[in-house]
């Protein structure tokens, strides 16, 4: 524990003469650990961080419009790779895994123990919009791998822009089952149950990128390093995310 504190302190104890005001784009489904990391970073450095949350596709479109900001944190490596291909990031790093799971409300789970049973049921499904959020593509791939893609697609009644929005639909009963993140399902495990995922279901990587547009590259690198530090990763795993392999 002392070693962990020492590592974190080394990352965060460099203070600027004038506090930096950083801008971070972050996937909406990552908000809980991000808020904890930002709070500690601000407390220990005196710098400030403004966070713009949204679906990973949404924040990518936003950045491509304004071309300003310091860091970009997405629920899937794909979005940061796109920025890398356009020379908008000069450093990227994987933090944890963002795993899609099929979560079913406990009051609707009776008789549903497989994707076959789900495909034959009358349950209403929700998934993420693959153009807007990281887990949307994972949901589509999960359906394909299940062998019941058409039947499952026919049951979709909503495609959400963020995983947070999708979780609300599930908890409010607007849908009976939804492909959400493992971390979100873990937090409401008293209300939902999970189906075993088909073999090959993609495990997205929560990835951070340091933007070339940063006005404070030194301080942005500091925050980048903290996200990837043992303490930063712990904030994510404490919320149900899985360590990167």
Curated annotation (Swiss-Prot):
Signal peptide limits: 1-19
GO molecular function, one term: metal ion binding
GO biological process: molybdate ion transport
Keywords: Metal-binding, Periplasm, Signal, Transport
Main location: periplasm
SUPFAM superfamilies reported for this sequence: Periplasmic binding protein-like II
Family: Belongs to the bacterial solute-binding protein ModA family.
Role noted for this protein: Probably involved in the binding-dependent system.
UniProt protein name: Putative binding protein HI_1525
Organism: Haemophilus influenzae (strain ATCC 51907 / DSM 11121 / KW20 / Rd)
